[in-house]
A protein has these predicted regions:
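Two-component/phosphorelay signaling modules centered on CheY-like receiver
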Residues: 9-32
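Structured loop/turn residues at beta-strand edges in well-structured enzyme cores
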Residues: 23-25, 44-45, 70
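CheY-like receiver
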Residues: 47-87
């Protein structure tokens, strides 16, 4: 199963990538901003699943979803419960 991680905190991205690799996911890329994620998702075949942090350094992941129709399953990874209803 292929995956993309959208996470701006480097240690969190590394931990998630390691965890996914242990469970036979192929992590295609770890992206750390709305801008990079939007560009990558517009230019590449979408993975089976996208793991997205909600708060990123240059905005939030909902901006990505407004710009790109993502055909993948999405798992939101965040410590902020105020985003639960939006997600």
């Amino acid at each position: 199963m292929t995956a993309v991680i959208v996470e701006d905190e480097i240690p969190a991205g590394i931990r998630l990538e390691r965890l996914l690799n242990q469970h036979e996911f192929q992590v295609l890329v770890v992206l750390n901003s709305v801008k990079k994620a939007t560009a990558w998702l517009k230019e590449n075949k979408h993975p089976d699943i996208v793991f997205m942090d909600i708060k990123l350094r240059d905005g939030n992941c909902f901006e990505i979803l407004d710009k790109v129709k993502i055909e993948s399953k999405i798992v939101f990874t965040t410590a902020f419960d105020e985003y639960a209803l939006n997600a």
